Design a protein with these regions (language model features):
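Gly/Pro- and small hydrophobic-enriched strand-loop and loop-to-helix capping segments
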Residues: 213-230
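Conserved alpha/beta-domain cores
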Residues: 1-203, 209-211, 223
């Protein structure tokens, strides 16, 4: 299939999943994950109307941003972020979805103050017990939100999570449910609005939609099999 056909197919799958879940498809957006694909693929997706793209690696985001040189693109960082990469995130990214510790929040705040800008962020929540998964333990999130509330440079929009890597649908669904309930709890107890739930990828987005996801991070279903990582 062409890229346009793949995008259309995924959009239809999302529409049907929303229908089954009794949700408005307008409440769920697709975030194309362009990691490991070249900037020409991003350019093709832009021709289809896409302007937001997610990257795991800061260096790859920077390379594509420089190659494309288009200020209309919104780059979203979704991978684990080392504090020594904060400068590049502040320069090139419009959103960070992997805020998972106070040290990183402090480093971001310092750089953002120097740059005179704000950054949309999502707190990454660890919703399973897999050692390979990163993110903040759910029980630590409420206090973390209170702590960083004074950081005017960080615009906390909601939560992101990666569900357990398993074929058991119920275990995947519970990961998403856990994060949605945590979001609801934080909104109720802290009187704040956290509209974004970035949950669900190519293999599990239908379950994420059932549990209230507002943003799906879709890569291979849109772009095809990933090329080898350089």
């Amino acid at each position: 299939m062409s890229l346009a056909e793949q995008f259309a197919a995924v959009n239809e799958q999302v529409r049907l999943a929303c229908e089954r879940a009794g949700r408005d498809p307008q409440q769920v957006c697709i975030l194309p994950v362009s990691k490991t694909f070249g900037h020409e693929v991003v350019r093709q997706a832009m021709a289809l109307g896409q302007r937001q793209f997610a990257e795991n690696r800061v260096q790859e985001m920077k390379e594509k941003a420089l190659a494309l040189n288009d200020s209309s693109i919104e780059w979203v960082v979704i991978g684990y972020l080392q504090t020594n990469k904060v400068k590049e995130v502040v320069r090139y990214a419009s959103q960070l979805q992997s805020l998972d510790r106070l040290e990183l929040a402090q480093a971001l705040d310092k750089r953002l103050q120097q740059a005179g800008r704000r950054l949309d962020v999502l707190v990454q929540v660890k919703s399973s017990n897999e050692e390979s998964k990163t993110g903040m333990a759910p029980e630590l999130v409420p206090q973390f939100l209170k702590t960083i509330r004074d950081y005017d440079t960080l615009n906390v929009k909601g939560f992101m999570t990666v569900a357990e890597n398993t074929h058991e649908q119920e275990r995947i669904r519970r990961c998403f449910e856990r994060v949605r309930q945590l979001r609801d709890q934080c909104q109720d107890e802290q009187g704040r609005t956290l509209p974004v739930l970035s949950m669900g990828m190519s293999a599990d987005f239908a379950l994420a939609i059932q549990e209230g996801s507002t943003q799906l991070r879709i890569g291979s279903a849109l772009f095809g099999q990933r090329p080898p990582v350089r």
